[in-house]
Amino acid sequence: MITVATAECFTLGKIGTTIHKIASGYEECKNHRYYNIINGNVKIISSSFIPSIEGAEKLLNLGAPLPKCDYEYSYSKAYTEKNDLKVAHILAKGLKNSLNCNIAIATTAGVGRGGICIISDKNEYLFTTDIEGDLISKKNIIQRQKNGIDKTINKFVEILKKEYFL
């Protein structure tokens, strides 16, 4: 069984929840296009929505502080796209190290296309959504979120097929 954990910000834990529902055989997911790949082969060991620096540092035992935010925004992380990519990588690495899972997925997005990182047992994948968004002005954040969820799940399944031969 392939173990998976997520630390999500702009995707609000929906990647982990979706994978969990498919893996667990929820009735509403039995017609999902990836059901036959995920169900019976994958289990979510942790799925987290972590919007704050404080939460990420404490929960993931990162060993070093995350970068200071590029933008002032309530209590949530808000970075440029370049730093979103760095932070997503740090979060995924912390998650993988803390939980010793096969696949760690992390997402974060402030201003830009956001940052998504998937770390498997063999490789690290760092990418963005296809949608420019701005957490501060709330521009395109729902569209960016939906695109990020879909793109990440598609990449996750691609990794399962390529690296785990499913």
Curated annotation (Swiss-Prot):
Q: Which InterPro entries match?
A: HcgF
* Coiled coil residues, start to end: none
| Secretion signal, residue range per the UniProt entry | none
Tell me the NCBIfam families matching this sequence: PRK00962.1
Q: Which family does it belong to?
A: Belongs to the UPF0254 family.
Query: Could you tell me which HAMAP family the record lists for this protein?
Result: UPF0254
Q: What is this protein called?
A: UPF0254 protein Maeo_0668
Q: What is the lineage of its organism?
A: Archaea, Methanobacteriati, Methanobacteriota, Methanomada group, Methanococci
